[in-house]
Structure formats: structure tokens, C-alpha cells
């Protein structure tokens, strides 16, 4: 396992995990829930 591959996987997982969270936060702020 190269360090570059590990960092890319970590970044991808962070983006995939933060995506729905950001959308949920924006929805809560706008009151669309």
C-alpha cells in the first residue's frame, strides 16, 4: 500500500461522508426538513 493510495482513499471517504452531512446541514438551515 502506497502512502498516496492511502491518502486518496482517506480523502474519498471523507468527501463521501461529508457530502450528505453538508446537504443535511443546508436543509436544516433552510428549514426544508
From Swiss-Prot:
A GO biological-process term: photosynthesis
Topology class, membrane: Single-pass membrane protein
Highest taxon above the source species: Eukaryota
Record localization: Plastid, Chloroplast thylakoid membrane
GO cellular component terms given for this protein: chloroplast thylakoid membrane; photosystem II
Regions that span the bilayer: 8-28
Keywords: Chloroplast, Membrane, Photosynthesis, Photosystem II, Plastid, Thylakoid, Transmembrane, Transmembrane helix
Protein purpose: A core subunit of photosystem II (PSII), probably helps stabilize the reaction center.
Subunit structure: PSII is composed of 1 copy each of membrane proteins PsbA, PsbB, PsbC, PsbD, PsbE, PsbF, PsbH, PsbI, PsbJ, PsbK, PsbL, PsbM, PsbT, PsbX, PsbY, PsbZ, Psb30/Ycf12, peripheral proteins of the oxygen-evolving complex and a large number of cofactors. It forms dimeric complexes.
Protein family: Belongs to the Psb30/Ycf12 family.
Protein name per UniProt: Photosystem II reaction center protein Psb30
Taxonomy of the source species: Eukaryota, Viridiplantae, Streptophyta, Embryophyta, Tracheophyta
